[in-house]
């Protein structure tokens, strides 16, 4: 499987998603015939803490490459990923700090849910267009909530109702202990659909991967 990032890998900034689209999408651009997953760029945007402003419509931030002001919201993220023509597109979400207070976390997760619904609507529109390279592009929604079990579980239940192609658990391995991460996974996974793939984002040590597989994640 290939992994591309809408912002960090600079596919939107350089060479530009329109350039990739003109070349036939990422599979032809990379000469790769296996599945490709593209991240939404959300994590990388939110990692630019001093350079971005979060609004209901999306996020305004300054490019780390040339300093220009860029806007990215759910629709823009889906449009970029549609141009890239990946197999799986990740929904645009906010990845708050794991030490964010509970009130902020609850508000952030509620906004992420609203953004997810906008992602789903925009992907349905894009997949119906005649010039879309991959009209079968799949959408994965991302569970957030930091280390707060009740927020995580409620969010998992909400996004499970949207009947997406797959799901992911995000916002982990960002400073919390391994024990806290496993505690959250143990609480959240039972509330995500068993018949859909679930992707644990940003976790990559061998021990972490084995624990995730044991919990039925990929």
Q: What do these predicted regions represent?
A:
Residues 8-11, 25-125, 143-150:
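Active-site beta->alpha loop and helix N-cap motifs at the rims of alpha/beta catalytic domains
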Residues 18-21, 51-53, 104-106, 154-156, ...:
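Short, glycine/charged-enriched secondary-structure capping and boundary segments
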Residues 27-28, 131, 190:
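Short secondary-structure boundary/capping segments
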Residues 11-23, 99-109, 127, 175-188:
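Active-site-adjacent beta->alpha loops and helix N-cap segments on the catalytic face
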Residues 125-133:
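Flexible, glycine/charged-enriched surface loops at secondary-structure junctions
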């Amino acid at each position: 499987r290939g992994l591309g990032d809408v912002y960090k890998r600079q596919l939107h900034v350089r060479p530009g998603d329109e350039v990739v689209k003109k070349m036939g999408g990422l599979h032809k651009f990379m000469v790769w015939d296996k599945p490709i997953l593209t991240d939404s760029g959300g994590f990388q945007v939110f990692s630019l803490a001093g350079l971005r402003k979060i609004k209901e419509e999306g996020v305004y931030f300054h490019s780390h490459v040339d300093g220009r002001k860029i806007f990215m919201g759910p629709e823009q993220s889906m449009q970029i990923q549609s141009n890239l023509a990946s197999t799986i597109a990740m929904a645009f979400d906010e990845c708050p700090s794991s030490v964010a207070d509970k009130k902020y976390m609850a508000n952030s997760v509620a906004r992420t849910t609203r953004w997810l619904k906008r992602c789903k609507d925009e992907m349905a529109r894009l997949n119906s267009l005649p010039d879309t390279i991959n009209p079968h592009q799949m959408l994965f929604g991302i569970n957030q909530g930091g280390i707060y079990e009740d927020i995580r579980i409620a969010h998992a239940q909400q996004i499970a109702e949207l009947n997406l192609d797959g799901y992911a658990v995000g916002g982990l391995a960002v400073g919390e202990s391994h024990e806290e991460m496993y505690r959250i996974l143990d609480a959240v996974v039972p509330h995500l659909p068993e018949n859909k793939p679930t992707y644990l984002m940003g976790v990559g040590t061998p021990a972490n991967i084995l624990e995730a597989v044991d919990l039925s994640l990929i």
